[in-house]
Structures are given as structure tokens and as C-alpha cells.
């Protein structure tokens, strides 16, 4: 259960379990279209030949890819390649912490990452994300479907306690994680409607991060363009796009999620993507979802079923 501290999430349990986490693999640079370099951790599938599934696993707000190491390692041990990038504006040494250059840059970076992997034609790319990373996974996957890119083919989307919208039915109104600067947000939104982006760099969102969880990698605030580029444009429309292109969706959420009402996630997703599989995992909270062995087990079972249903062999 969540602790009773002033923080939004149960960091006490999360940090107490940290010693049991898998060590993260090293960041490996990849080149982006603007000639900048970003980092990604790669977890190769276990076995001599490895599987054909490649999961792009995205971290949540304020964090970087390190806390996903245990989940990535378990999935790799189950025969899936996993790639966990540090999103632009995050990680150990971003060019500008908490900021990006323009609203679509995170999507472009993910396209560049997938292309940099130089995957074989029979590779199965699945985009997954935790929390705000889940929102970006949804946004990016829908954009790829709508653009009909011939060089990027997706085979599924996995949402782990995803952020959808601040007015989505599953959003807890009393969550203390995000600290919006409403006046700045309204000003930027109005200017953007007028085609003006001169203030897109200003900070509009802070995070309630306990001191013991902060380190040199922590990103404690977002600019307007990073916040806007990370969140789904229109989560209902994005889900409809995935359904239209018959892209399968798995959504997992912890029973004790402190940010979202777990029992309401299905009603957010299934009216727009009726085939979306939604599961509530007992005894798990928001942060624990990203480190629990049960999460890896449910993802692995779903990937195996998807592959079998489509007439292939697991992997």
C-alpha cells in the first residue's frame, strides 16, 4: 500500500527494494537526425539465437532508464531484446535538462533509435512505456501508424500504468506528483494556437521528488515543449488509430497505483480500442509496477500469445 508521507508515490518501499534490482547495462550512443547523440541501454535476448521481439521500453517523468533494468533483464532472459533509451532532456548529461527543441522531437528520436538498430525484416518491434513513458508509447505508436512509414513496422503496444490526460477518468485528482504552473501553461497554449512558440522553452511542470531519490540524473521540471511532446495528443484518437491498424495493446496497472484509479483504466481504453487487454495486478503500486517480476511474467505471456495467434513461433 502507498505510504503516508507527503510524496505522491511510495518511494520508501521503492528505494528499500533497490539493492535487489538488476544493474543497468551501459548507455550506448545513437545518432539522431539533428546530428546530436542520445543514449540507450540494450539488453540482448538470452539464448544462442535470441528472439525476434524487440521492445522499446520508455521511462517515466523525471527519471531515466536505470530503474527499468530489472524489468528489461527479466524480459531479455525470457527471450526478448529490450532497448531502454534515456529520453532527450533526461539522463546523466542532457544538452538541456527538461527541454527539447520542438514538440515532435521525442517522436523523431524514437524513430531514429529504431532505425539505428538495423533490425532484420522479420523483427517484431513493440513499443512499451511506464507512466508518462506509456503516454509517449501510445502517442508514438499512433503517429507511426498514421504516417504509414514503410521503414518502421510495429507489432504491439504495452502501457504500464500509463498517463493519458489530466482529465482522463482514471486520473486521481489528489495526486501530488506533478506540480503544474497553470498561468504559464495557459499562456503557452494560447500562444501555440496563434502559431507562436517563443515561450515553449519555459518551465511549466515540476515534480515532487524526495531528496533521497534525487541524484545527478534527476530531471525535476519540464518545459512546455517537453511536457507537450511527451503526452498523448489525443489518447482516444490515438487508441482508435491503433485499433484501425489492428495493433494489439496490453495495459497493466497496479491495484494500489497512487496516480491513477486502477479500476477505471479499462473504461479509458476499451471504448476506443475494444481488443485492448487490460489487467490490474494485485498488491502492486505505481513504482512497483516497473520492477515487479509479475509485470515481466504478464508481458511475456502476452507476447507469446500474440505471436502464436498470428501464426508464428514464440519469440
Regions found by a protein language model. Give the residues of each.
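Conserved alpha/beta-hydrolase "acid-adjacent" motif
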Residues: 258-264
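Alpha/beta-hydrolase
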Residues: 185-241, 247
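Catalytic histidine-centered segment of alpha/beta-hydrolase-like enzymes
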Residues: 284-294
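The serine-hydrolase catalytic nucleophile loop
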Residues: 61-73
Amino acid at each position: 500500500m502507498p505510504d503516508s508521507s507527503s510524496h505522491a508515490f511510495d518511494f520508501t518501499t521503492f528505494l528499500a527494494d533497490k539493492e535487489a534490482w538488476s544493474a543497468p547495462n551501459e548507455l550506448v550512443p545513437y545518432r539522431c537526425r539533428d546530428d546530436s547523440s542520445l543514449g540507450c541501454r540494450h539488453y540482448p535476448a538470452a539464448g544462442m539465437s535470441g528472439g525476434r521481439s524487440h521492445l522499446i521500453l520508455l521511462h517515466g517523468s523525471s527519471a531515466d532508464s536505470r530503474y527499468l533494468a530489472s524489468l528489461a533483464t527479466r524480459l531479455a532472459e525470457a527471450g526478448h531484446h529490450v532497448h531502454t533509451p534515456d529520453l532527450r532532456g533526461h539522463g546523466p548529461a542532457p544538452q538541456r535538462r527538461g527541454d527539447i527543441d520542438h514538440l515532435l522531437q521525442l517522436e523523431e528520436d524514437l524513430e531514429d533509435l529504431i532505425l539505428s538498430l538495423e533490425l532484420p525484416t522479420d523483427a517484431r518491434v513493440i513499443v512499451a512505456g511506464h507512466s508518462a513513458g506509456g503516454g509517449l508509447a501510445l502517442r508514438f505508436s499512433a503517429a507511426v501508424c498514421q504516417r504509414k512509414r514503410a521503414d518502421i513496422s510495429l507489432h504491439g503496444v504495452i502501457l504500464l500504468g500509463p498517463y493519458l490526460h489530466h482529465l482522463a477518468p482514471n486520473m486521481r485528482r489528489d495526486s501530488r506528483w506533478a506540480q503544474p504552473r497553470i498561468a504559464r501553461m495557459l499562456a503557452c497554449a494560447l500562444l501555440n494556437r496563434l502559431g507562436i512558440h517563443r515561450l515553449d522553452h519555459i518551465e511549466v511542470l515540476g515534480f515532487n521528488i524526495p531528496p533521497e531519490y534525487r541524484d545527478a540524473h534527476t530531471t525535476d521540471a519540464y518545459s512546455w515543449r517537453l511536457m507537450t511532446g511527451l503526452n498523448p495528443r489525443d489518447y482516444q484518437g490515438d487508441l482508435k488509430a491503433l485499433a484501425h491498424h489492428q495493433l494489439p495493446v496490453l495495459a497493466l496497472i497496479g491495484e494500489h497505483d497512487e496516480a491513477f484509479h486502477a479500476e477505471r483504466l479499462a473504461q479509458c481504453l476499451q471504448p476506443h480500442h475494444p481488443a485492448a487487454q487490460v489487467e490490474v495486478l494485485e498488491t502492486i503500486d505505481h513504482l512497483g509496477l516497473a520492477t515487479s517480476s509479475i509485470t515481466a511474467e504478464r508481458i511475456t505471456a502476452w507476447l507469446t500469445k500474440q505471436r502464436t495467434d498470428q501464426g508464428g513461433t514464440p519469440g
